[in-house]
Amino acid sequence: MYSAYATPVNQDQTASSVTVLTEKDFAERNATYVSDVLKTVPGVAMGANGGRGALTSLFLRGAESNHTVVIIDGVKMNPVNGGGFDFGGLSLSNIDRIEVLRGEQSALWGSDAMGGVIYITTKSGLYKDKPVNLDFDIGTGSHGTVDGSATVSGYNQGFYYSLHGDSHHTRGISALSDREFLYKGRNGAQYRPSFLGTERDKFHRDNASARVGFDDGKKGVEFLTSHSSQTMRYDSYFDAKDGMNDYKTRIRDTLYKFSGYLGSDQDLFKHKINLNRFKTDNKDYYGRYTARRDDASYQLDFNFDREGDIKQSLSLLTDYNKSRYLGSEYNHKLKLNEKSVALEYRLLSEEDHSLSISGRTINNSQYGHAFNARLAGAYRLSPNFRLHAALGSASQAPNVAEYFGYSGYSIANFELKSEKSRGGEFGLLTQTSDKRHNLDVTYFARNVKDLISDQIVSCITPTWCTYQAQNMSGTSHIRGVEIAYSGQLNDKLNAYANYTYTAAKDSSGLQLIRRPKHVANGGLAYKITEHWGSDVNISYVGKRVDDNKHRYQMPSYTLVNLGVNYQLSKNLNIYANLNNVFDRKYESTVRYGQDGRNVYVGLKGSF
């Protein structure tokens, strides 16, 4: 477990609510993109502005989409302009593991972690069984979808490397829905589209990465670089006759990272450094922006109690962040610098008891000072029962668009304050003695002050308005319950199921948009024979509200996906997925279409 503490720990010792997903879970849940598998996790709700590749936002435990930090290989990947991470184009082809850490995490991960952390680890080549390994995955499906990826990696006497490339293309569906949905809104308002989507909105993404390093367990260094390029078409609310119904966004992301460590968890001291640069070049109909974030961090682990069943340690973390942003909507370059220092104390027991206390102070050149803390603990009552609880605070600085405005559609507000959250959770994990069955029930709650929301300043037409980001008065309240089960029913049958209830209301008592009260997921994976396997997955998303102005009521929907796979040989596996089996027509965001019934077939190999 890499996300819950400053150092890796066993999942059984973690006090926070966290879900771990591996390649086995990706396959059993019919997932080809990160968004496919994340939506099956407790506490997660997602909204997409169209089909594959379209802007896709994640809402974790009722938090805003930009309140969840996304970490890939130890690097914060949230947009430099401060918006929420877009999961629409992120493929699983090079991903080894995903951790979804829920709750206030700013004490460890800084700003952007008010709702939690999505921690993603890609394939590194470290500890591979031979010097040269080849992994590939090719697939094709409905809507002219074609995917391909290949990874060459290896490990020998401490040295390791990984070279990866992938490409994804789909002719797609219309981003604007091609079907008419009628929604009722505030004060009897009704929404019925004046026109429907007609053309397909294509999506294409290419990605390449290279990694080389050395690790002997006592010391290690690594260099990682990656580059991705994606182009996606999307639609606007305007009629086709205005010539504005076919938009395109092109995004180029480049990452350079150098990291190293000296010492082990059994040594008194362990040192870690991390230097990285993340660059973005984004061009769309409205304009273009380039951004760069440079980050330098140092961590010192002090393992002062290393003997016996109980181990104690301290970690000191320092971080310096420098961001630069230049957009066509501004006449000058925006510069932000941030310095932070964090301290974490950990007590871990061989009997799965744990206690952690952490705090972080942040000083931002534009938004000032913030301090956040977290207390988390777990106690195993017996081999079958374990209590876990956490309390924490978090903060979220305004993003660039909120603070400085954007392209005349949003007015600057230099009086904005950072959003602040205080919350906690309490849960009970029940396990069988052999840990083949696990049931976790967790209650969570948070209060958010100074929540930032776009407010209408003026309107030229009913659909063309000028906005300004403002801090809402009062306190927003979020309460909920997560129930999650995972189990091995027998040697051939695995199952998972989860249900999340979320009551997310603003200071006026109105439900926050795009947060369904009820979400449920479940699935079975069955090993039919030595070569044949199958799976079925069901997802339910309850009623929710969209559009702050009109507050349209959106109905619930249920999706069923089926999968089958066949082991051709020791090294080759063919699989086929039938998604949205009953061809359910629905929208996750008002006005934007989603895939109906669709098929995907692929071949995986490992040599």
Q: How would you name each of these model-derived features?
A:
Residues 1-27, 65:
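Short, acidic, small-residue-rich periplasmic hinge/interaction motif at the N-terminus
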Residues 35, 39-75:
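Extracytoplasmic beta-strand/coil segments of soluble accessory domains associated
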Residues 90-135:
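A beta-strand signature from Gram-negative outer-membrane beta-barrel systems
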Residues 119, 127-129, 135-139, 146, ...:
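Periplasmic-side early beta-strands and strand-to-turn transitions of outer-membrane beta-barrels
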Residues 213-230, 247-370, 374-380, 438-443, ...:
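Face-selective signature of the C-terminal outer-membrane beta-barrel domain
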Residues 240, 245-259, 263, 365-367, ...:
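Outer-membrane beta-barrel signature, preferentially recognizing the C-terminal barrel domain
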Residues 352, 445-447, 470-547, 573, ...:
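Gram-negative outer-membrane beta-barrel transporters
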